[in-house]
Amino acid sequence: MTSSAFQSLPRRVGVAAIAIPLIIAAAMAGGHWFFALVALISGLSLYEFYNLAERRGAFPQKSVGIVAGFIVNLAFTYERLQVDVYNYFSDMGIHLAMFSQMQFLLFVLLIFLMVVLMVELFRTKGSPTVNSATTVLGVLMISLFYGTLISTRELFPYGFPVFKFFETGFADDVQMAMIERWGGYTIVSLLASIWICDTAAYFGGVRFGKHKLFERVSPNKTWEGAAFGFVSAVLTMLLARILVLEYLRLHDAIILGLFVGVFGQMGDLIESRFKRDSGVKDSSDLIPGHGGFYDRFDSLVFVSPFVYLYIDFVVLS
């Protein structure tokens, strides 16, 4: 550990001691609390990404992108939101025809794209192509991917096939509470797997690292460290299955661990590439001792879509 890293250790530990319990509490609570947490992290990560793009001469439409990103995040709570909106208007005697979740998401992305292109007609800064591309990329890569994390939590209980896991074919209050807990435990286990993967990759690389993984992008990362991270991610998900995720089969836990071990480290490399291209070490200094939100959650961005798709279309189908 370098002297600067050692000096920042108390701040890092202090921030982690506050942030980790809050994240766990929001994950277990689900609903609006978890949405608010993810939307906040998503918005700040997107802001940092746009700042990186600006350092390379782009002029992304920050306000448009951040607002669109929030609505994209909101789209992943649409089933819950749809019920609230429909009931609100029904109480006033108004019966609305509602979008499906996919229709709403596509509508939001279509309007967002049209607004970005129209705004560039009136701007005189930079390249319209580069400005539009960076604005759209940020929302698709960050907001959309974070949205799938929200959707993963929303599967419990809204997308949970009770008939598949309970012999009665329906869930009583105790079983519904169990399903809710599974949702929170799934998110917490995913985060734990990512953090343990990162930690194991770092210390494994320091102790045993000899062969560079991707020197042009991240000179300190090694194949040996990546292997330690990969194995640790799988073992963490297997342990989570034994302790709290009883609905997972053995191979499900292994596959989810594989997603973390592969796509989590890939996400870290991709963010490192963006930062190196922009000539900075951290995406920001918003989190004392940790850098920026994009720095801390870069792995989560790329893992979340694969976890959501697998749980929704394989585990719960």
Please provide the spans of the model-predicted regions.
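Juxtamembrane interface at the ends
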Residues: A201-Y202, V206-R207, S272, R276-V280
